[in-house]
Amino acid sequence: MERAGPSFGQQRQQQQPQQQKQQQRDQDSVEAWLDDHWDFTFSYFVRKATREMVNAWFAERVHTIPVCKEGIRGHTESCSCPLQQSPRADNSAPGTPTRKISASEFDRPLRPIVVKDSEGTVSFLSDSEKKEQMPLTPPRFDHDEGDQCSRLLELVKDISSHLDVTALCHKIFLHIHGLISADRYSLFLVCEDSSNDKFLISRLFDVAEGSTLEEVSNNCIRLEWNKGIVGHVAALGEPLNIKDAYEDPRFNAEVDQITGYKTQSILCMPIKNHREEVVGVAQAINKKSGNGGTFTEKDEKDFAAYLAFCGIVLHNAQLYETSLLENKRNQVLLDLASLIFEEQQSLEVILKKIAATIISFMQVQKCTIFIVDEDCSDSFSSVFHMECEELEKSSDTLTREHDANKINYMYAQYVKNTMEPLNIPDVSKDKRFPWTTENTGNVNQQCIRSLLCTPIKNGKKNKVIGVCQLVNKMEENTGKVKPFNRNDEQFLEAFVIFCGLGIQNTQMYEAVERAMAKQMVTLEVLSYHASAAEEETRELQSLAAAVVPSAQTLKITDFSFSDFELSDLETALCTIRMFTDLNLVQNFQMKHEVLCRWILSVKKNYRKNVAYHNWRHAFNTAQCMFAALKAGKIQNKLTDLEILALLIAALSHDLDHRGVNNSYIQRSEHPLAQLYCHSIMEHHHFDQCLMILNSPGNQILSGLSIEEYKTTLKIIKQAILATDLALYIKRRGEFFELIRKNQFNLEDPHQKELFLAMLMTACDLSAITKPWPIQQRIAELVATEFFDQGDRERKELNIEPTDLMNREKKNKIPSMQVGFIDAICLQLYEALTHVSEDCFPLLDGCRKNRQKWQALAEQQEKMLINGESGQAKRN
């Protein structure tokens, strides 16, 4: 029984796909003809286009730019420089700070840490005005025993609520007067000078019945330690009860001679703190009544009892004054720290602020800061000088020319060499510095009396970077010059720590600024030389303006494309056609001049002395990407930004390739190896890509919004890094597994990123898919580059290269190619074909070339066997 032929309906169904394919070929031919005959196309559009067609043309080319918070335009300057755009990686790993205050202590109602002064300036230093205190109750002078207890309680109450040493001691003396009835009372406090030598200063002098606090506290008398009655009591810590002062050899009658007062009997007692240290001396003079005008044992007991209260008062007051002083010091140091880290741009400005702070706080006449010359340690590179009269001025320059010669460098030089502070109470009496004799007798304002000089060290404490010199500490009330004391030394020692930090930070900032300025100049010069020549740009622009052949005419949509017959200028025209046909020029408002210059600049930055990884390889990678997008039907799976980034990445992925791989860069200890921990050359290629994109006249991304710009750069970087085969091998397993399980989804952002990386590798390796004659020729170029690297490894690194790089193993190329296809290529193109069946030509070409290389490998093996057997027969 004969089989019936196909019905008419079946024949019609079979003919329809053939007619559709023929119709598509006719349309492609017409479109290619129109692209090649632009004058006719333009004339036809002008004559035949309707309003609907024009509106549709506009609607097709409207590029919607999302509004972002940072702004739509004008980002090319702020984001143009990769150095400015890349955020700094935070590699710091701070340890757990030492707890210095418990969490519960923060809940205590303390004063605010940061306060505002009367002018509204934020400061750590609180207002110095004291809170108003309750006035002292006047003493009562009842003589009965019961009332003495009430007076003691009253005195204890005053001591617990007041910290004014002078007022409290004055009241204590008035209480004492009611018991021992002396004519005069005096209070002397123990002090120390800068040399830790003790002396006595009167806090109350000649307190008498009816005297006021102001009268007895104005006179200030200094007594030497262990001299006179008071000095002797202070030194020994034992009381003295003297009946006749003039009969005691320790008595100094000079005060009587000055005041005209006649001293007869003296009761002098030490005032001690809880550690039994003498902190003061109290003196009662001339017993008024009873016992022949001399002080009795009862007077001594009563005097000692009340002086115990004076000891408590002095101790509490000293603790309070010390805490206030430390608090003020810490606040000043905090203000200084804030000042230092607020200003780091100018060394002169920060030193002016430091000097002004020191002069204001320490009440000195002059402050000079010497900066050590880094190149010559025996001299100073700069000197900053300020005087107290300049505090109210707003001068920006500290050192004036007419003052420079009056600054004495000798003390600073001495301190720099010894690395120890120097405190001279009176320079005219110091025997260590003979040059100071020139100041003797000089009473003008330029005279140096007291001096404090401290080294400024760096953070490691082993190098002096400067010296701070203070001249003439002034009395706050009288303006007289006085010596610097130990407290001044300690404060300045803490002060210069912050000064050292400020100086170091500012010097580092200035050094970084200079380095950045040099880098900017270098980048400017590099950008100029990296950019294409203007004549070449104008030539390409004029050719592109006249006519750019269609993609079909140029055959750049074919996976079997070859560039061997094209000139460099023609490859640039092909690149323009790729950007045009992918609608990138229209969608992102690219200027033709800028696009032409960018393409030529990219071409220029590929090294011509590299056999394979040059401009032609980059162009072929971009052509394969274009063919995959167009003929492989991948374009409709991607966004416009992704297409733009992929094409830029394909053209730029091997910029400035040196003809060697990452392994050679690492083993040769090339400076590039110090910049990146992996994918060394790929990171360098991306940096070169950024440099060209941001060079003047090459900014093809200037039409993007800020968010689009950031997104595009991110995709470009990921795509270029994906061409590192080490990363490809690491990530391909996940991609292949998704394809195998039929779970691949381009809507997933991570899978989309993974697919773009695989697509970049497929295009980068596309030479393995070309027709056999093209594949053979490219393989020779690759082998030439690899063998050149092997020669360099032997010569420069003194190592034996691998077979892939070994010129002596050239006969193994076919077998190595087969191994490369099996290990790297085949599975990739199989997976890509699963994503888009129209990419099958890549897989087919790869399989055919494997067969060719396999045949050559077998032939090579037979020749090797035959050669060995023939050699054996001859032997």
From Swiss-Prot:
The keyword Protein transport does not apply. One of its GO terms (cellular component) is cytosol. Its cofactor is Zn(2+); Mg(2+). It is an enzyme of class 3 (hydrolase). Phosphorylation is regulated by binding of cGMP to the two allosteric sites. Phosphorylation by PRKG1 leads to its activation. Residues 1-29, 78-102 are annotated as: Disordered. It catalyses: 3',5'-cyclic GMP + H2O = GMP + H(+). SUPFAM superfamilies: GAF domain-like, HD-domain/PDEase-like. This is cGMP-specific 3',5'-cyclic phosphodiesterase. It comes from Homo sapiens (Human).
